[in-house]
Amino acid sequence: MADISLPKHENVDFQSKKTFSNKDLIECSRGLLFGENNAQLPAPPMLMFDSISNIEKEGGSFNKWQIDAELAIKKDLWFFDCHFINDPVMPGCFGLDALWQLTGFFLGWLGCSGRGRAFGVGEVKFTGQITPEVKLVSYHIDIKRVIKRQVSLAFSDGEVFADGESVYTVKNMKVGTFVPEE
């Protein structure tokens, strides 16, 4: 296999960039956006959004940061074939994972180094579902607090919408980045 050199991003000001395309997200899943050993998104099919439409520094419920992303629903998405047969619905844990993914992406965007991991969630409520009839899933994150030290942590609340209707709410998510010991 050929050696792939990752681009250097030390001088890139990600905080001036407010939107990210699907191509950007795929680059992030390969470790090409924020640099080697920094926050990565999972690759498709586990990448749970197509684009990030907004990252806003002053906004959201806590007047810190807010992040919005979207996923266009296609009837042939892989999970509809198996969850459940003759009763297709997107697994609720995938919506939660999307919110964790988005919070982890935010830490990379903020310049926090290290690999991202979900550390927990306080409360999850499911009030609806995502079926093949849904056209667009929207994700919204409100960042409550960020700690930037040897391990960086983001604390956030989130919400998932199916065609504009709230279907999941999440409180007290914790996502962090850490530099693995060698």
Language-model segments: what does each one mean?
Residues 102, 108-109, 114-125:
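Conserved short alpha-helical segments that host acidic/polar catalytic motifs at enzyme active sites
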Residues 86-88, 96-104:
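Compact, glycine-rich, soluble single-domain proteins
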Residues 1-89, 109, 114, 127-131, ...:
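Non-catalytic linker/capping segments at the edges of enzyme domains
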